[in-house]
Amino acid sequence: MKLINKIITLLKKNLILLFAVWLIIAIIIIPALSLAIVQGSVLASPDIDASLPFVGNLTYFISNPFLTLGYIFNPRFFGTYLETLKNFTGIYFLLVVFLAYKYEESKPYDGKEYGSARWSKNGEQYKILSKTSGIILAKDNYLPVDKQGNTNVMVIGGSGAGKSASFVIPNVLGLLGSYVFTDPKGELYDKTASYFKANGYDVKVLNLVTPAASDGFNPLLNADTPTDVDIITNTIIRGQDTGATNDPYWDNMAEQLLKALIYFLKATRGPEETNLTSCANLVRLANNSGNFNVVTDLMEILPPDHLARKAYKNVELATDKAYSSILSTLQSKLGKFESPEIAALTATNTIDFKDIGKKKTVVYVISSDTHTTYNFILTIFFSQMIQQLYDYADNNGGQLDIPTYFFLDEFANIGQIPDFDKKIATSRSRKISFNIVLQSLDQLEAIYEKTYETILANCDTHLFLGSNSFKTAEWFSKSLGEITIGKEQESKSKGKGEGSRRKYY
């Protein structure tokens, strides 16, 4: 029954082919074979040499099919033809049965049971990549900026893997639009700033290593909404470890007090006084004098329903002792803004984030690669920059005038940008590309514990330069997929004549 089923399956799948083979042989080979058997002597034709041997006649008749077909219905020949055809058909049927016995129905994934991944070959990668223009991934391999899907790239490479030399710096030459670079050592600025200037770019620098050489960045002047203020206060209070307290209550109260002070300054002071150093000065004044009514008296200038009064309400209710602790906590958090250099850097704004999307601009963000003292400023800087670019795009027909490319080397040093998983998921339509550079995936997970997989998934392109991180290597290995190199089958039979058989593929 199994053999019959195999025969039926073989016929269903190959009926036309089997019939075509039989028909060709029946019309061309069998007539020639029949004529060769009778040696052609029974046929009266000047074209046939009866003295030729069997093989010679067979060759002659096969090479002259039309002559051979002319003898099919010759009475002397037709009987031999039918007999030969009958014998052939029987042999052909037995051959079909044999093939059915050996036939194993092919399956869609035969030979691919464990995977079918492979490296591209013969230029297959150029179905997606370009040879001439776009974001440079490798020699003669560019990621087209107009490709379907996003142009976000995740670059992973350990220390010394060449992340800057082989990826970031080569992409400077493209001049594809505006650029934002994190520059941990300041080397990128030294090597490329003059090139951008020569090509008509506005060059801006946020320099946290040498603040005196930096453009101004005053986050309070960019805070246009309560959400903006929330990001600033949350980042300053929770984005730096001053060792002041382990009790979240004090951080919560310090954050509310800082909100109240920011809202107060924005409502009552001019741009030159609306900065975080002014906040630090007010806190120090109240804390050092022991006169806790200093801040309360300022707040009472404002209407009861003002945002500053609302934020200050819970702080105001604290006991003198608790109020003193709140002031001390906030003073420790704002201590860095009392540094003359940082005070000068954050006093003014000379970087208009929206200009990045309007005209060709390059921004270098230089920070220390040996300590994280000012990393919380980076978090605020990038949060505000990205949000303002998105806002400009949304009010400009849905996209920037100038495409903007972020090359974020040592991305982990920036800290957690609020809602970055949502930003990177919607960047393509706004003509924004994020190129994230890390030493390992562990760094990404440490900062974005709950959303790192979403961020990773929204980078359509992954560039792996090597890493000693097992988790990183394992992730890339699994992402590449598997290939079926071989398959072993073993079958065993029990009872009389017990044995086993193995097949290797």
Model-predicted segments: where are they?
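Glutamate identity and glutamate-enriched acidic tracts
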Residues: E83, E104-E105, E113, E124, ...
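Intrinsically disordered, low-complexity segments enriched in small/polar residues
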Residues: T68, T132, N287-N288, S493-G497
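H-loop/switch region of ABC-family ATPase nucleotide-binding domains
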Residues: L438
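Hydrophobic, aliphatic-enriched repeat segments that assemble into extended interaction scaffolds
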Residues: M1-K2, T9, K13, V180, ...
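Basic- and hydrophobic-enriched, low-structure N-terminal and domain-boundary segments
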Residues: M1-A161, A165-S166, A212
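P-loop NTPase motor core of the ASCE superfamily
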Residues: I91, Y109, Y249-Q256, A260-Y263, ...
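P-loop NTPase motor domains
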Residues: I30-V38, K107-Y109, P144, G149-I432, ...
